[in-house]
């Protein structure tokens, strides 16, 4: 379907020599105007879908993986430098998971049904040109992940990257484009504008050559995409709760919660944001978090922290002060007069369930712990804190009934039992990896299939049935 099985034309021209001027004024996929970026991607996609076989896609995806692996340390360092957020060593781990565990064309399996009346095939066909909006929290990781997934499905991509990460994003995109061309693929299979803006997104939404809108970011961005009138895949905000009940392995819970909540300074939408510990588990969990290296705040220090890192929002609630998002715990603690070594990756505070730290998605290594009177109360509190995002939640328990009851109550896209929530996207857990978790639009843990159309071909009158 759509050229997925077509042979590459004989005598196809070799990749252009280094220094050859790209078409439409672009520089290895980076354009000054969004319309040029879309036009170049549209031309590339027509070539890609018509003239490249699945084995060609697989070969080029492997070239992308090799290219990205060679830049992991460089891009991880540059993200920290440009965005001012997160931890270098954790970004290296994120990159490697994205590179190694994002599925390619191999997941585009064909469904076939044969019966008395004939044969039916359903296959995955490309949408065409996809607009992909990427976040500042995972800039190059999302470009790598989306590039592999989207071009594996036969699409091309026009990225609108986050302005705070535009330099490293452009470097990443240009390197991947070079790898694609050197492996025999078309120029400009992935493009972007040098200066990303929301106006560019509006222009792409209005451009008939863009057939699918995809975005990884906050709720406002997803709502903007949904108003575009086009097919949308949206990955929105989360505020993932964790429940630790009295049957849990408390040592394991302390280790994994510390690991997950401090990972990349908690800027990931799927990272643990608040904990509800039941009864006697509460004191033990806080003790285990301290043993891992967390700094436990006093009540007075907690209130100082609220004033420092949160601010009122227009809806009467609280939101993170962007100055402190993704900063090291030691830096945040120093600002309220608490001196800890740089090895301290997490601050912990014991608070009531209606505390601002519980209800606001703070995206920094400050973890509130609520002591719940019962498992039922913990579930109610956790569901309220999750705000109906249906994003991510986790539980530490040996009680299967508790695991099941919380899963049914919270209804999240990702649900992790007895591990850090990053295991839910393949970072330290089974299953494939993605940086686009499409909870609001229902695609879930996206892969190449998510960015394809289902097409059906039927041969009737009993044709091809051999039994």
Sequence positions of predicted segments:
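ALDH superfamily catalytic-core signature
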Residues: 28, 222-353
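Structural signal for hydrophobic packing residues in well-ordered secondary-structure cores
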Residues: 5, 38, 42-49, 64-72, ...
């Amino acid at each position: 379907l759509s050229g997925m099985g077509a042979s590459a034309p004989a005598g196809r021209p070799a990749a252009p020599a280094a220094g050859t001027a790209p078409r439409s004024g672009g520089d290895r996929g980076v354009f000054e105007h969004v319309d040029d970026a879309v036009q170049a991607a549209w031309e590339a996609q027509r070539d890609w879908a018509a003239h490249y076989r699945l084995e060609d896609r697989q070969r080029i995806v492997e070239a992308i993986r090799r290219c990205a692996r060679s830049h992991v340390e460089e891009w991880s360092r540059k993200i920290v430098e440009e965005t001012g957020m997160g931890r270098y060593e954790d970004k290296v781990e994120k990159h490697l998971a994205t590179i190694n565990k994002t599925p390619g064309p191999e997941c585009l399996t064909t469904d076939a049904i044969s019966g008395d009346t004939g044969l039916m095939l359903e296959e995955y066909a490309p949408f065409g040109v996809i607009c992909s909006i990427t976040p500042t929290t995972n800039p190059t990781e999302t470009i790598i992940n989306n590039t592999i997934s989207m071009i594996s499905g036969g699409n091309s991509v026009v990225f609108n990257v986050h302005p705070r990460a535009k330099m490293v994003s452009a470097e990443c995109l240009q390197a991947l484009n070079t790898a694609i061309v050197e492996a025999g693929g078309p120029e400009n299979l992935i493009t972007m504008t040098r200066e990303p803006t929301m106006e560019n997104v509006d222009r792409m939404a209005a451009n008939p050559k863009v057939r699918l809108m995809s975005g990884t970011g906050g709720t406002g961005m997803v709502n903007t995409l949904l108003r575009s009138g086009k097919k949308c895949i949206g990955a929105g905000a989360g505020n993932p709760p964790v429940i630790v009940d009295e049957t849990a392995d408390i040592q394991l819970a302390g280790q994994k919660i510390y690991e997950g909540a401090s990972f990349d300074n908690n800027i990931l939408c799927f990272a643990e944001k608040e904990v509800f510990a039941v009864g006697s588990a509460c004191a033990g969990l806080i003790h285990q978090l301290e043993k891992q290296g967390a700094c436990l705040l006093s009540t007075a220090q907690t209130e100082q922290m609220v004033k420092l890192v949160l601010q009122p929002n227009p809806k009467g609630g609280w939101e993170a002060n962007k100055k402190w998002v993704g900063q090291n715990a030691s830096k945040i603690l120093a600002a309220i007069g608490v001196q800890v070594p740089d090895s301290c990756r997490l601050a912990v505070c014991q608070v009531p369930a209606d505390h601002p730290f519980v209800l606001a998605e703070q995206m920094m290594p400050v973890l509130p712990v609520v002591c719940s009177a019962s498992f039922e109360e913990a579930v109610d509190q956790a569901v309220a804190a999750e705000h109906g995002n249906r994003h991510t939640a986790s539980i530490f328990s040996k009680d299967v009934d508790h695991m099941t009851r919380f899963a049914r109550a919270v209804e999240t896209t990702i649900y992790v039992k007895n591990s850090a929530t990053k295991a839910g996207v393949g970072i330290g857990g089974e299953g494939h990896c993605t940086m686009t978790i499409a909870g609001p639009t229902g695609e879930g843990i996206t892969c190449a299939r998510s960015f394809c159309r289902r097409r059906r071909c039927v041969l009737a009158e009993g044709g091809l049935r051999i039994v």
